[in-house]
């Protein structure tokens, strides 16, 4: 039995899905509100649903290339059918041979298998070089070998049926559907008509349709006619081969109509030829499609910036290109792991990055917290369309209203102008004429001004200028340092040695001691001198008193 690719989700991805599902239970779906941001030059261009896809599931589609005509009309179309049959064999035999070579390259020895596999691939490669992608595709082809063998076992019954769509389940390890685009044409044209058709008309109709289908076959395969390991068949190619009957297989594999158009655009539905039988003209294709998990609460919002007018010149907001919001949490979304379609993102993993408080506040509607960069030049397109209206920087270009006639002026201090059908029905911007059908309601903020403190330098030329100023400042500082060094060089280094410093300290202490002793001695001598003066003064006074007393006597 053929091996079946595992659809088990790896543990890290399962954890991511569980976290996202928990958030979806407690938080409503959110997206960035672009109404307060538009006048600040930040435009939300659209939202996309975020999905996770993992290991693919597979099914087989058996294309019945040769239709069965009604018995009474076989002779009529024998000539074009025979020519078509020969052309098919010539066209697809190299493909069948290449498939067989790759599938037969499997051997029991481990080392020989890789060598034979690469050799089988190189056999169908013009330059003799097998890329890793081709080796991987060939390995998948080998894995489908048993399923292809089981289909060939039922080839006679599949070729004999007149049904345009026929589910084949007997002995197959995966879902297989036999379809016949040409059989559908035969059934519609001949089996269900009541009018008689002449032989010539039957032959002409069959011949034209067979030639058209041959053209589609050559368009579908291209270089893969010689090597099935070159490229995968796209979903568009599969539809060309199987017609509308392709929907039957996709529905059986669980792809809903609401998801089908998005998956077709994603390129995740592909096919690989696994067999070709020239006897019955059956072409087997293994169809691969992803298992998709929807994150109902998560939306990816795409942001574009418009050059706005500031007092420091033209600038654009510094915001991420893609953000996602869950509840009150806004983070930057890395889309390098995702495949984008018009409405959806299909990611193998969800990777987000936290934003600074300033950017978070800006995207939450606080435009005064938005930061701008002087990176937009005058040649940048100064306008952007959104929902039938226009956001334009009318200071960078002339906003001329054709109907009603007039010039739309942008007031001083305004970052951009919001123009809708209420103010102008037909608008001319730099030679481009636009008919406006949208309208900015009252919830859109207008007349927003960008402060000088919100504009920073990030452009290459501006940064070079600022770096030049910094270099000048550094040069001036170096000159001052050189001058200081010259002054220091004049100082005697010997006087600043350790031993000299110790000597200076000791001498200073001795000097202080002698100074203190001298001060004490001086104080003592002064005290003694004053005492002597007092004694002499007393003796003088006493002698004078005695002399006065003697005189009186």
Curated annotation (Swiss-Prot):
Coiled-coil stretches noted in the UniProt entry, renumbered to this chain: 142-170, 466-491
Disulfides per UniProt: 338-347, 362-370, 394-399, 401-424
GO terms, biological process: fusion of virus membrane with host plasma membrane; symbiont entry into host cell
Pfam families per record: Fusion_gly (PF00523)
Segments on the Extracellular face: 32-500
SUPFAM superfamilies in the cross-refs: Head and neck region of the ectodomain of NDV fusion glycoprotein, Virus ectodomain
Transmembrane segments: 501-521
GO cellular component, one term: virion membrane
Keywords carried by this UniProt record: Coiled coil, Disulfide bond, Fusion of virus membrane with host cell membrane, Fusion of virus membrane with host membrane, Glycoprotein, Host cell membrane, Host membrane, Lipoprotein, Membrane, Palmitate, Signal, Transmembrane, Transmembrane helix, Viral envelope protein, Viral penetration into host cytoplasm, Virion, Virus entry into host cell
Membrane topology listed for this record: Single-pass type I membrane protein; Single-pass membrane protein
Regions of this protein lying in the Cytoplasmic compartment: 522-553
Site (Cleavage): 116-117
Cited Gene3D superfamilies: 1.10.287.2480, Head and neck region of the ectodomain of NDV fusion glycoprotein, Newcastle disease virus like domain
Xref: InterPro entries: Fusion_F0_Paramyxovir
Family from the record: Belongs to the paramyxoviruses fusion glycoprotein family.
Protein name as annotated: Fusion glycoprotein F0
Lipid-substituted positions (S-palmitoyl cysteine): 523
Entry-listed glycosylation sites: 85, 191, 366, 447, 471
Signal peptide bounds: 1-31
Keyword Membrane (UniProt): yes
Function, as annotated: Class I viral fusion protein. Under the current model, the protein has at least 3 conformational states: pre-fusion native state, pre-hairpin intermediate state, and post-fusion hairpin state. During viral and plasma cell membrane fusion, the heptad repeat (HR) regions assume a trimer-of-hairpins structure, positioning the fusion peptide in close proximity to the C-terminal region of the ectodomain. The formation of this structure appears to drive apposition and subsequent fusion of viral and plasma cell membranes.
Key word Transmembrane helix present: yes
Primary residence: virion
């Amino acid at each position: 039995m053929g091996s079946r690719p595992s659809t088990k989700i790896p543990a890290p991805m399962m954890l991511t899905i569980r976290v996202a599902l928990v958030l979806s239970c407690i938080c409503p779906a959110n997206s960035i509100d672009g109404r307060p941001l538009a006048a600040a030059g930040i435009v939300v261009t659209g939202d996309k649903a975020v999905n996770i896809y993992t290991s693919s599931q597979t099914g087989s589609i058996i294309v019945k290339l040769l239709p069965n005509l009604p018995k009474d009309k076989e002779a009529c179309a024998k000539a074009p059918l025979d020519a078509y049959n020969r052309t098919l064999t010539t066209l697809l035999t190299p493909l069948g041979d290449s498939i067989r070579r790759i599938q037969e390259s499997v051997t029991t020895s481990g080392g020989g298998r890789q060598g034979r596999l690469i050799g089988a691939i190189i056999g169908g490669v013009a330059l003799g070089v097998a890329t890793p992608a081709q080796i991987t595709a060939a390995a998948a082809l080998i894995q489908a070998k048993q399923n292809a063998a089981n289909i060939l076992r039922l080839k006679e019954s599949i070729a004999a049926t007149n049904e345009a769509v026929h589910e084949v389940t007997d002995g197959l390890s995966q879902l297989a559907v036999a379809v016949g685009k040409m059989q559908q044409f035969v059934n519609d044209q001949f089996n269900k008509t009541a009018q008689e058709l002449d032989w010539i008309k039957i032959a002409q109709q069959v011949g034209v349709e067979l030639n058209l289908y041959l053209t589609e076959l050559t368009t579908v395969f291209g270089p893969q006619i010689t090597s099935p390991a070159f490229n995968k068949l796209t979903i568009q190619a599969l539809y060309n081969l199987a017609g509308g009957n392709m929907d039957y297989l996709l529905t059986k594999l669980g792809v809903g109509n609401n998801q089908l158009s998005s998956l077709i655009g994603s390129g995740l539905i592909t096919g690989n030829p696994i067999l070709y039988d020239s006897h019955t003209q059956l072409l087997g294709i293994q169809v691969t499609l992803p298992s998709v998990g929807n994150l109902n609460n998560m939306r990816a919002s795409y942001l574009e910036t418009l050059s706005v007018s500031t007092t420091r010149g033209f600038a654009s907001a510094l915001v991420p290109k893609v953000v996602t919001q869950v509840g009150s949490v806004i983070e930057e979304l890395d889309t390098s792991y995702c495949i984008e379609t018009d409405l959806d993102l299909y990611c193998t993993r969800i990777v987000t990055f936290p934003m600074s408080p300033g950017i978070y506040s800006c995207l939450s509607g606080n435009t005064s917290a938005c930061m701008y960069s002087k990176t937009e030049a005058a040649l940048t397109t100064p306008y952007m369309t959104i929902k039938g209206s226009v956001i334009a920087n009318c200071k960078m270009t002339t906003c001329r209203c054709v109907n009603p006639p007039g010039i739309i002026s942008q007031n001083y201090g305004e970052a951009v102008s919001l123009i809708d059908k209420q103010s102008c029905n037909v608008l001319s911007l730099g030679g481009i004429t636009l008919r406006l059908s949208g309208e900015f309601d009252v919830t859109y903020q207008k007349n927003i001004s960008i402060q000088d403190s919100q504009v920073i330098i990030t452009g290459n030329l501006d940064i070079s200028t600022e770096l030049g100023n910094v270099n000048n400042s550094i040069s001036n500082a170096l000159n001052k340092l050189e001058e200081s060094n010259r002054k220091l060089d004049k100082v005697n280094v010997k006087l600043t040695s350790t031993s000299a410093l110790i000597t200076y300290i000791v001498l200073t202490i001795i000097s202080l001691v002698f100074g203190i002793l001298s001060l004490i001695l001086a104080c003592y001598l002064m005290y003694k001198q004053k005492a002597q003066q007092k004694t002499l003064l007393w003796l003088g006074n006493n002698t004078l008193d005695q002399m006065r007393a003697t005189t009186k006597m």
